[in-house]
C-alpha cells in the first residue's frame, strides 16, 4: 500500500495522458474534414541521483563589547575552517559570508505595546558558511557530525543539505526526446484505431518540468516542482503534440 501511495503522483499523470489519448482518438472519429488533427500528450520520466551537495550553516557570538565579539567570532571561524579541512573538505569549497551585526536590547512596553524603556544588552554577530562539493556522501557525513564542533564551544546552526544535479540540461533534452517519442506512438495508435494515418506534425508544446523525491508522495505543481531536499530524485516532463491526419 505504501508503494502505491508513493507513486500516486506519477500514476495520476499517466492516467491523464492515457485519457487524453482516448479523447483524441474519439475526437478524430468525429473529425471535420477541413480540420483533420489529433492531439496527444507524451510522458518522459527518469530517476537520477544528485551529484552536487550544498550545505549551509551559521555561527554566532554575543558580547557587550563589539571588539570582543569580533575576536570570538574570528576564533570560531578558524576552528570551523580547520575542522572542515581536517575532514577532507577542500578550501575552495568553503565560502564564508560577511559578518552580520545586530544590537540587542531588553525592552519594556506599555499597555498599547509602545516601548516604555530599553536597555542595551550587547551585540550579536552572525556569519554564514557554505560548503559546495561534488563529494556528496562525504559532506553528508560531515553535516551529521557537527555535534563535535558544538561540544568544542562553536555555536553552530546547521541546515539540511541541499542536493542538485549538474547535468540537468542534458537530462531535460533526453526527457523531451523521450516524451516526444511517447506522444508520437500514442498519436500513431490513435490514428490506427480510427482507421487513418498520421500526417505531419502541426504543433508541439512542452509541459512543465517536475523534479520530485524518488518514491515519495510529493505533490506535483502546475508551475513545476524542483526538489532540493532529497539526494535521489525523479524528473518528469510532458510533450503535447498535434498532428495532421490523412
Language-model segments: residues:
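Short, charge-dense linear interaction motifs
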Residues: 1-95, 99-246
Amino acid at each position: 500500500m505504501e508503494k502505491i501511495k508513493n507513486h500516486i503522483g506519477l500514476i495520476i499523470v499517466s492516467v491523464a495522458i492515457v485519457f487524453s489519448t482516448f479523447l483524441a482518438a474519439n475526437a478524430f472519429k468525429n473529425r471535420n474534414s477541413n480540420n483533420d488533427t489529433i492531439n496527444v500528450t507524451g510522458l518522459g520520466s527518469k530517476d537520477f541521483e544528485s551529484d552536487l551537495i550544498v550545505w549551509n550553516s551559521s555561527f554566532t557570538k554575543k558580547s557587550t563589547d563589539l571588539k570582543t565579539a569580533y575576536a570570538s567570532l574570528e576564533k570560531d571561524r578558524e576552528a570551523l575552517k580547520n575542522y572542515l579541512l581536517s575532514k577532507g573538505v577542500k578550501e575552495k569549497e568553503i565560502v564564508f559570508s560577511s559578518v552580520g551585526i545586530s544590537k540587542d536590547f531588553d525592552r519594556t512596553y506599555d499597555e498599547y505595546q509602545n516601548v516604555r524603556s530599553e536597555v542595551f544588552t550587547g551585540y550579536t554577530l552572525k556569519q554564514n558558511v557554505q560548503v559546495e562539493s561534488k563529494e556528496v556522501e562525504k559532506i553528508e557525513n560531515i553535516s551529521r557530525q557537527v555535534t563535535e564542533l558544538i561540544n568544542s564551544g562553536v555555536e553552530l546552526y546547521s541546515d539540511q543539505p541541499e542536493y542538485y544535479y549538474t547535468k540537468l540540461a542534458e537530462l531535460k533534452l533526453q526527457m523531451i526526446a523521450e516524451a516526444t517519442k511517447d506522444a508520437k506512438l500514442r498519436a500513431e495508435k490513435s490514428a490506427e484505431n480510427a482507421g487513418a494515418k498520421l500526417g505531419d506534425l502541426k504543433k508541439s508544446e512542452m509541459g512543465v518540468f517536475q523534479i520530485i523525491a524518488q518514491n515519495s508522495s510529493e505533490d506535483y505543481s502546475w508551475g513545476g516542482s524542483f526538489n532540493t531536499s532529497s539526494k535521489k530524485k525523479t524528473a518528469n516532463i510532458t510533450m503535447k503534440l498535434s498532428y495532421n491526419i490523412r
